[in-house]
Amino acid sequence: AITDSIEWIIVGYLLWTMSVAAYGGLSWGVAREAQWGTLEQLFMSPFGFGPVMAVKTVVNVLEAFLWGGVTLVVMMAVTGRWLAVDPLTVVPIVALAVAPAVGIGFVFGGLSIRFKRIENAFQLVQFLLIGLIATPVEQYPLLRWLPLAQGSKMLRTAMQEGVRLWAFPAADLAVLVVTAVAYLGVGYAAFHYCQRWARREGVMGHY
């Protein structure tokens, strides 16, 4: 049981690190641009503000992948628990698992454009991510539709039991993909709504 707990902590910490990078890079990025007074300049970009922030988020996640990989090796070496790390399995699962975190980042990035100083809420969400990662999907299957829940379960299974991506049930893969696309899409839509709302209220450049 203790061994399982250690392995769970390793996997959970890895996913949490990735999620915070994906979520925080977007929400905090928008808040910083507003503080520095450069937010409106980004909106005048020919590429559009949303795509610019999305690219920044991808870069943040890639950096998190690098540091997460190093941290994973260190944690496994320190604990003596070597997990299965198949890149063809772990990378796609992590990418799809953190997509809802990007969606949440878009939501709070949009809210920070409209309501400005909400950084305290950003910190609370980081703790909420821990709860989502620890969701007991096995006991309560309906909870797998929550952000990060299904990805966390599948990542634990892949790394603790050595299950390959193509060996997962089709239903599990479907839930992972649907939740990733749905939360990311809803978050991006909410971001654009808040952006237009801020422009209508004339508070885009205020902080």
Sequence positions of predicted segments:
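Residue-level signature of transmembrane alpha-helical entry/exit and packing/kink sites
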Residues: 5-9, 13, 86-93, 119, ...
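Alpha-helical transmembrane segments and their short interhelical loops
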Residues: 49, 54-116, 173-178, 182-188
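Junction motif at the cytosolic side of a transmembrane helix
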Residues: 178-207
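Hydrophobic alpha-helical transmembrane segments of multi-pass membrane transport proteins
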Residues: 6-76
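Transmembrane alpha-helical segments that form the membrane-embedded catalytic/substrate-channel core
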Residues: 18-26, 98-107, 132-136, 187
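Small-residue-enriched core segments of transmembrane alpha-helices in multipass membrane transport
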Residues: 10-18, 90-103, 126-131
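Transmembrane helix segments
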Residues: 112-153, 157-158
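Short amphipathic alpha-helical coupling elements at transmembrane boundaries
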Residues: 28, 36, 40-44, 109, ...
